[in-house]
Swiss-Prot record:
Keywords: Cytoplasm, Heme biosynthesis, Iron, Lyase, Metal-binding, Porphyrin biosynthesis
Localisation: Cytoplasm
Organism (species): Lactococcus lactis subsp. cremoris (strain MG1363)
Reactions catalysed, as given in the entry: Fe-coproporphyrin III + 2 H(+) = coproporphyrin III + Fe(2+)
Matching Pfam families: Ferrochelatase
GO MF entry, a single one: metal ion binding
Family, per entry: Belongs to the ferrochelatase family.
Function in brief: Involved in coproporphyrin-dependent heme b biosynthesis. Catalyzes the insertion of ferrous iron into coproporphyrin III to form Fe-coproporphyrin III.
Name this polypeptide is given: Coproporphyrin III ferrochelatase
EC top class named in words: lyase
Binding residues annotated for Fe(2+), in chain numbering: 186, 268
GO annotation, biological process: heme biosynthetic process
Origin organism lineage: Bacteria, Bacillati, Bacillota, Bacilli, Lactobacillales
Cross-referenced CDD domains: Ferrochelatase_C, Ferrochelatase_N
Amino acid sequence: MDKKKGILLVALGTPRSCETEDVREYLKEFLGDPLVIQKPRWLWLPILNGIILKVRPQKSAEMYKQIWTDEGSPLMSYTIAQTEQLQGLREDFDVRFAMTYGEPRIDKVIREMKESGVEDITVLPLYPQYSLTTVEPIIQQVKKIDDKINVIRDFHQIESYTDLLAESIREKWQANHYDKLILSYHGIPLSYVTKKKDAYEAQCIETTRLFVEKLGLKEEEYEHTYQSKFGPEKWLEPATIDRIAELPKEDTKKVLICSPAFVADCLETLFELEIENKEVFVENGGETFDFVHPFNDSLEFTKVLSEVIEKNKVEVEV
């Protein structure tokens, strides 16, 4: 049967390898996106090309080397797995994937889908929460190709998503008597929320609210934080790494940490959270630091993606 409908999953992207030159090429595209770094081009590009791309790629490459696997980038491996599983669940669609930055490119994959006879494409960014820095670049790239293509903006309120998020934590939380659960979201500059009206912070807060209700957590049992601060500008707070350093001094020695904004392991989860933050916690007197990985290749998460597509299909038809 000819497949006339298609689903395109889109993740952030990843360097081709963990070698410095490949990391530099990736960072140049990512940090060069005016939606990611919202500064005047005349100011930002000389800083990016003259300073950051001369220093940061080597440092980032060393981080990537600590998380790289025999299959390559974990983010790439898990995105491929999610795509293959979703294709198995949705035989009525042609399911493919692309990356916002790097390969495979969004425009190339959409053109390939159209050339193969797919006429109705739905794009699903692999971000539960919308942000100007993550989902909007996907929307803009898609619009340049075909402004009639539907892009799903977020799915943080889908009950099956928050149910699965809670279930991924519940058993470990109940069995190990942690002092606190840390919900660490990727941060963005505060000005993107206050001046650009990015909905991201509000959607993260809503995700936490729905999640802790399902787990029945008391206010003192969890904290909502933001990670991955970049540059001198003020970002959303509190910063994960700052709280991780402070908690042992507040007699919080056993923590469980999760990352609800990520659906697949990547540098920010495997290195920043699981390695870097753990080291800071232990150095400051912490005793137990356990990390709950994102959904990765969980079939249950792929079923959530299928439900997101189905709900969107109904909404579009209505």
